[in-house]
Amino acid sequence: MKRTKKINHSSFRKSWSARHLTPVALAVTAVFMLAGCEKSDETVSLYQNADDCSAANPGKAAECTTAYTNAVKEAERTAPKYATREDCVAEFGEGQCQQTPAQAGVAPENQAQAQSSGSFWMPLMAGYMMGRLMGGGMAQQQPLFSSKNPASPAYGQYTDASGKSYGAAQPGRTMNVPKTAMAPKPATTTTVTRGGFGESVAKQSTMQRSAAGSTSSSRSMGG
């Protein structure tokens, strides 16, 4: 009877480990790469108007005015729209809403809602985020909204058109945000029901807290 060749268990274990751990290593690497991509990678400043920007950036008054003007135009294009003043005020508070012409691209059923006045209602732009003014390039900007109704999830917060919050509505702050935060938002093509924007803010806040918790857990596991 032939003797069975002696198995090199050490070599076997190494081979098995390398073969089976490689995918895990790749997965871990992918996670860290994704985490790196999601890190805050752009510094922005929060201003209420062009004067605030000019005061913080001496000699850049023209650029500040242009950025503010562009932010206002972007707000008109992307802000939540309401069929009635009452719906907007219920969300953002008294004195925080303005009429805006019914724009092209709005769904026909929503256009019909505004036929009597020829316009919708939208929140006033409370401030805007602006990227750094560097060289001769024009800085990006993103309009921000805020509610003065204590019952709204957006109360006292700076939020963009998607409902994502950027903290307390206090101009003059500088913060780091993902580059995606400065990307243009889609134009508003439907009206929002009363309380609808607040729901979006609440959902976004929940997602942000969940993401922050996951990041914290990952760091804890990593030691």
Swiss-Prot record:
Residue segments, region Disordered: 165-223
Pfam families: DUF1190
Regions of compositional bias (Low complexity) in chain numbering: 177-193, 209-223
InterPro entries: Biofilm_formation_YgiB (IPR009576)
HAMAP family: UPF0441
Family recorded in the similarity comment: Belongs to the UPF0441 family.
Name of the protein described by the UniProt record: UPF0441 protein KPK_0672
Organism: Klebsiella pneumoniae (strain 342)
Species classification: Bacteria, Pseudomonadati, Pseudomonadota, Gammaproteobacteria, Enterobacterales
